[in-house]
């Protein structure tokens, strides 16, 4: 299930450089994180939905690749994004 338009716009405005910045790494990671969190609630109820679980694993992998890219290019932005999203403990 995808995020609503309002939720997407809110995330883009919060993490992007402007309201139309959907391509920056920060925004992409934040959107993937929101979708992953949404799907985790889905799997609490539908434990045998393996088709959607494959999509979840793709999203997690894509987020990992984007975070690795950001860590290589700009460590300060990487650590700030990790803190804002609460991804690492």
Curated annotation (Swiss-Prot):
Keyword Ribosomal protein: yes
Signal peptide start and end residues: none
rRNA-binding is among the record's keywords: yes
Domain of life: Bacteria
Matches recorded under PANTHER family: RIBOSOMAL PROTEIN S15, BACTERIAL AND ORGANELLAR (PTHR23321), SMALL RIBOSOMAL SUBUNIT PROTEIN US15M (PTHR23321:SF26)
Complexes and interactors: Part of the 30S ribosomal subunit. Forms a bridge to the 50S subunit in the 70S ribosome, contacting the 23S rRNA.
Name the UniProt record assigns to this protein: Small ribosomal subunit protein uS15
The organism of origin for this protein: Salmonella typhimurium (strain LT2 / SGSC1412 / ATCC 700720)
Keywords: Ribonucleoprotein, Ribosomal protein, RNA-binding, rRNA-binding
Any single GO CC term annotated in Swiss-Prot or TrEMBL for this entry: cytosolic small ribosomal subunit
UniProt family annotation: Belongs to the universal ribosomal protein uS15 family.
Annotated GO biological process: translation
Protein's job: One of the primary rRNA binding proteins, it binds directly to 16S rRNA where it helps nucleate assembly of the platform of the 30S subunit by binding and bridging several RNA helices of the 16S rRNA. Forms an intersubunit bridge (bridge B4) with the 23S rRNA of the 50S subunit in the ribosome.
GO molecular function: rRNA binding; structural constituent of ribosome
Classification via InterPro entries: Ribosomal_uS15, Ribosomal_uS15_bac-type, uS15_NS1_RNA-bd_sf
